[in-house]
């Protein structure tokens, strides 16, 4: 009697294992996957908008960045190297702009938003933060040794989490000096 109760779930498990293995093998990280061209990009959820001179630049889900040169009547999609959700965009000059979003992504454009390059992501941000605080601790710039060691350990822990933290806003005073939060 117990054998009959065990066999169906066991068969179901055996039959689904190849599907799970196939899904895992085909997974691509959104930080390594460029945003897909989509006719619906301008109609998808857009989280942030900015002006790049007369151009309107909007950012949204799946790495979509759309541009309008006619006040929003028509939109074109920009080339974006990631498919992480983007939440904010800012242009301190008509040509130079910054966009931020999930997975710790920071993008930069030097051509009014037509193309974007990755400046930082959650993987490299953790490594950068850990190396900075380790160097500061080595110089004695972080205060007492036990506090400095705890801070260095915390930055290493944050870095080990990977790219799960988001940047939610961006602002630049000029094309080189700004803040991301």
Model regions: which residues?
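Short, functionally important structural connectors and interaction interfaces within domains
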Residues: 7-9, 38
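N-terminal secretory signal peptides that target proteins for export/translocation
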Residues: 1-4
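Residue-level hotspots at or immediately adjacent to binding/recognition sites across diverse folds
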Residues: 21-181
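Bacterial N-terminal signal peptides
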Residues: 9-18
